[in-house]
Amino acid sequence: PVSGHGHRRKMANHEMNVIVTGGDGDGYGIGGNHFTHTARRNTDLTYIVMNNQIYGLTTGQVSPTSSIGMNTKSTPFGNVEQPINPITSAIMNGATFVARAYSGDVRHMADLFQQGIRHKGFSIIDVFSPCVTFNLTNTHDFFKERVKKLEDENHDPSDWKTACEKAMLFGDTIYT
């Protein structure tokens, strides 16, 4: 899993600027333990996760971030498991830069990438990146109607409690 590989590269060369990319299935499912321990260790790397809430490259199975009730190839009667919330997990495990972006807002996403890369310590940017083939629920239109920037709310980044509360919202409002 990618965050484990990135962690090893950083340990081998502390001067290297490490940027790791992956998907929600790899990062939060298959590599979930690597994600947790990289955050816990506050390893100085940037982890960008394309979160499409489905295993898109393996033809549409439920992923760790799939919503309850989502019909997929592996859950034809709907997903029955609570989705993992990578933002609250990262905060609670000690990541020192935690952000969420939406791929439809390229400027905001690029700004978060720059901030994450400049940050000293573990930075994670979870990017809502709709799968146009297998996730027909969480589409670009779905996110365009709901996404709001947390910084527009004058959020205090040191307020973990409010950050977690806002990260748990996934309905009419979704904060990035």
Residue ranges, per PLM feature:
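Structural motif
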Residues: M16-I19, D44-I48, T88, T96-A99, ...
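Thiamine diphosphate
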Residues: P1-G56, D111
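Conserved thiamine diphosphate
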Residues: S63-G116
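Short, hinge-like loop/turn segments at secondary-structure boundaries
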Residues: T38, S63-S67, D141-K144
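Flexible, low-complexity linker and terminal segments
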Residues: C131-T176
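Solvent-exposed alpha-helices and their adjacent loops that cap or buttress functional pockets
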Residues: M11-H14, V20, T38-R40, Q82, ...
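Short, well-ordered, mixed-charge alpha-helical segments that flank or form enzyme active sites
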Residues: G27-I30, I54-T59, P64-T65, R107-M109, ...
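ATP/pyrophosphate-binding catalytic subdomain of soluble kinases
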Residues: A95-L136, H140-F143
